[in-house]
Amino acid sequence: LSADEKKILKKMLVERVAGRVPLLMGCGGNNTAAVVKDLKEGDWSGIDGILSVCPYYNKSSEEGLYQHFKAIAEASPVPVVLYNVPGRTGVNMSAETTLRLARDFENIVAVKEASGNMTQLEDVIKNKPRDFDVLSGDDGITYPLITMGAVGVISVIGNALPAEFSRMVRMALNGDYEHARIIHHKFSDLFKLLFVDGNQAAVTAMLHAMGMIENQLRLPLVPTRLTTMEKISSILKELDIRY
């Protein structure tokens, strides 16, 4: 999205959500000074928090990651959710650094964890401050993470199947693990397909198969391969999911 498109989208979302649920907005990058400038000069009205990804490409040290998020926490007018996704950034933020940030800054309130490292995730969940939340950043491990103590997910598949996937999350959070597990297994093949050609392309293909949108993306993203599209359509048909 261009800067102007982001402003339009933000305005639309603030109006549509109308305070019914907390609204997170992405604000991150690998140029700390630029992120801090955006936080200080941007319009954050109607936004309840920011989701800030680990700096990508630079491959910062653990101390570099700490200092990056320290600067963001000190500049942000709203709460900060850390985002650890080494598969996209090229760097993993350790449990130690995540916990250090959680303890040192009251406005760092959560982490979206997509490392897939269950030992690391357990370390964070076990040792975190009481008022710091762990959110899954990977749909496929959301159910097991909630059983370990995570409190939710920032989802990909939820863009296409919000009702059913959020039902699974609510069931798990309420301790109804048996029925939550049924939904988890029901979607297991879709979870895997999300990564075959990239999850942006996959969720777009899902919405297209449901008759909701055109199967179009902006470069450098392209639609899924035909074989992937056919598998997605077949699974949705088997699950009797349609718009």
Regions found by a protein language model. Give the residues of each.
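A non-catalytic, amphipathic alpha-helix used as a structural packing/dimerization or gating element
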Residues: 5-8, 12, 37, 71, ...
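Glycine-rich phosphate-binding "P-loop"
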Residues: 84-85, 107-108, 218-219
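Conserved short secondary-structure transition element at the edge of the structured enzyme core
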Residues: 147-149, 188-222
